[in-house]
Every structure is written in C-alpha cells, then in structure tokens.
Amino acid sequence: MSYKQASSETIKEQVRRHYAERIQSGSCCGSPSGCGGDAVPTEIALYGEEVIAALPSGVVTTSFGCGNPVALASLREGEIVLDLGSGGGLDALLAAQRVGVGGYVYGVDMTDNMLAVARRNAEKAGVANVEFLKGDIENIPLPANVIDVIISNCVINLTPDKSQALHEAFRVLKPGGRLAVSDIVIDGDLKGFPVTEEQIRAALDWTGCIAGALTIDEYRALLIEAGFTDIAITVQHRYTINDVGAMLAGVPGGLNVLPSEVVQGLVGCFTSSTITARKPGE
C-alpha cells in the first residue's frame, strides 16, 4: 500500500471543502460519546442543558467541537476573546455572553460557509459584541497584544503548521493573556506499529481530526517554543475504535485501510484533551 502526505495547501483546501459540506449536516469532529450520533445530546453533554436551551434553535447543530473551551477559559466581564476556527459560532456566542457588553469576541475561520452560518447565528441570538473574520489561524488578521483570552475547539489539530499557529496565538495575546483549548491529542505516540507513523496519519486522513493530532509531548514542546508558560494538558476522554470510526465517517481512507493489529493498537491513543497556557507578563 502506498502512502503520501499531502502538502500544506492541499490539506487546507481539503479542510475547507470538508467543513463546508459538514456545516450543512451538523455533524461534529469529536465528542465524549463519539461523533456519529445526534448533535444536540452531544452538545448538552459538553455544555450543559441550561446553556444549550438558552440558545436559538439551530445554533447547536452547527458545532464541530470536542470540548467546552468557554468553561475552561473562566472568562470575565470586559475581556477581549479570540476563537480560533470559530466554525458556526457556538463558542464565540457563548463567550460573548460571558464577557458582557463591555467585552468583545472575535471569531476567525477560513471557510466562507462557516462564516455565513456564524453571522446568521449571531443575528438570531441577538449578540452584538461578536465579529467573525475570514482568516487562517496561521496568519491571524489581528494586531499584536490585543487579546485577553484565546479559545479554540478541535481546530488546532487541523492546521498543517501548528508551530506557526501557536506563535500567532502568542503574538496576538496581551502580556498575561490566557490560552484555553479543547483538542484531539495523542496520549503516547504512534511508534512501535508494523507501519510508520506517517503511514498511519496518511491513512486516517486530515479532515477526520485525528490524522493531524499532536502527542502530549509535542503539544507541550510547541507551546514552550512559542513562548507560553503555565502549560497544562489534561486528558478528558479516550476515544474508542467506534468513536474514531464515527469521526472518520465520510472522509477518504479510514480504519479499514490499516492492518487490524494497528487498529487495535490505536485504542485509547486518541483523546479529547484540554490545553491551557499563559503568555508571560502582567
């Protein structure tokens, strides 16, 4: 079997196309119960029934997350927040409610369909202190030192140049600013299998959220390299083979192209984890 890792621009185009299509179906990237089921119960598990019930109909089904970075961030009134890969806008809208009229939230996404849905959702929710910008998280369209808190939900795994994305996050944060991320993370590594790590990642496909996932050690190293301190990475949920299969539904490749012993060895490696860090300063 032949494997070849796609180029950075090819990966980004695949991600754009995949999520432009997925926004129509409301399917997600990952969840504590797997990604193949009903989106509303999944989001209730992540955010709580009261939070979800307070949102306009349809907002919840445009979520593609694997956690609740808004709660993780412990947002305060008046803070300026940036949501990296804001998708349909769920986390950005919840953050806007938390920071109040004295705060503001920016959402950045590179997919036009997502931006259109997010803006409609903001209008339906009557939230004015939020703005959705077209952009790449490897080149954030904001000046340096303007953001109090960065949140992101199951997105950093999708970007080809994670080092650049984290350097950009560090750049736009104010001194003392916080990073609060939910993401797919590998606990351990993908070595020791009868195929190479590159072959495993290529077979799983980038758009399924797991092919581009970092290991815990890799994530920590890149955060340190970018300048972050007070780094904490915590496993919240370990994905089963059924979970991973559901996450890969509708994308090329998948578990069926890997040897069975590799598939069994992957059980528990892929996790939904929280990542917090801080930019040194005030």
Residue ranges with predicted function:
Residues 2-44:
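N-terminal auxiliary segments of SAM/dcSAM-dependent transferases
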Residues 61, 68, 76-139:
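Class I SAM-dependent methyltransferase SAM/SAH-binding core
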Residues 81, 150-151:
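Hydrophobic beta-strand segment of the Class I
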Residues 99-100, 159-160, 173-175:
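Helix-to-beta-strand junctions that scaffold the AdoMet/dcAdoMet cofactor pocket
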Residues 163-178:
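A short glycine-rich, Lys/Arg-flanked "PGG" loop and its adjoining helix->strand segment in the class I
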Residues 188-210, 246:
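Short, glycine-/aromatic-enriched active-site segment of Class I SAM-dependent methyltransferases
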Residues 211-227:
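Short alpha-helix
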Residues 222-282:
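C-terminal lobe and adjacent flexible extensions of AdoMet/dcAdoMet transferase-like proteins
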